[in-house]
Amino acid sequence: MAQKPVDYVTQIIGNTPVVKLRNVVDDDAADIYVKLEYQNPGGSVKDRIALAMIEKAEREGKIKPGDTIVEPTSGNTGIGLAFVCAAKGYKAVFTMPETMSQERRNLLKAYGAELVLTPGSEAMKGAIKKAKELKEEHGYFEPQQFENPANPEIHELTTGPELVEQFEGRQIDAFLAGVGTGGTLSGVGKVLKKEYPNVEIVAIEPEASPVLSGGEPGPHKLQGLGAGFVPDTLNTEVYDSIIKVGNDTAMDMARRVAREEGILAGISSGAAIYAAIQKAKELGKGKTVVTVLPSNGERYLSTPLYSFDN
């Protein structure tokens, strides 16, 4: 059924499609379904939390049109906030590690946002520190995606129920999501555990920065995952297991899915699909594995992920 016209672009956030992977999954493995979050108007899963955090602040009287928002971001949350701010009449300033892709930087600027780069060696901690400095100096409002309860709550209210409705009572045996802020995993995981008591919730993190597994933080190339610390927005009780994914493994899988499935996915999506394939092999035929593809590969055309010699 075609969607009826809406009054605001923010009204078309959510209700993203789910697609079965057919060519990268072994015949004797579980079925794998991916939720295409890059179909949101701002191009990623982070559109959901961007709108949720802004609307929460509006309800609480913390912001009004014309005010300035500041936020540390590895890219997609900033892009989501930038487009929401543009639509609602707010100014936006973002701090982000200098290691993030050129497309992400350009997208932020295209929406009229100001961008402040921080040292890549400091990862997200450096961006968070700089955002707090700007907030204190100028009195900006900071949504704080790593602390804001609206982050996991919006996934509990929308993403999780969408999956339950999309699978129409069918069993979901495992749900996997990469952990950046942990909002998606926490919110969706809570919903699915109520609906499917035997579902396995799996956290995905960078092999090079295995903080959730008890390891040390470190630099990695899985943009949007592995902040280098355990965020307040992550419910560490919701997941049952952790799968670590390497830089090259995630990139190779993202490229393969583009070639073999026609799905142009980002780096963290490559990590999600690789982890889903491992879980599908473990569970075996007849089971159902679901994961989220956070962003589109077009955001990585200037990076080694999709750089071609000719």
From Swiss-Prot:
Modified sites of kind N6-(pyridoxal phosphate)lysine: K46
Q: How does it assemble?
A: Homodimer.
Pfam families named among the record's database cross-references? PALP
Q: What is this protein called?
A: Cysteine synthase
Q: Which organism is it from?
A: Staphylococcus epidermidis (strain ATCC 35984 / DSM 28319 / BCRC 17069 / CCUG 31568 / BM 3577 / RP62A)
Q: Which pathway does the UniProt entry assign to this protein?
A: Amino-acid biosynthesis; L-cysteine biosynthesis; L-cysteine from L-serine: step 2/2
Q: Which family does it belong to?
A: Belongs to the cysteine synthase/cystathionine beta-synthase family.
Q: Which residues form a coiled coil?
A: none
Q: What reaction gets catalysed by this protein? A: O-acetyl-L-serine + hydrogen sulfide = L-cysteine + acetate
The molecular function terms of the Gene Ontology recorded here are: cysteine synthase activity
What SUPFAM superfamilies has UniProt attached to this entry? Tryptophan synthase beta subunit-like PLP-dependent enzymes
Name the coenzymes or cofactors required: pyridoxal 5'-phosphate
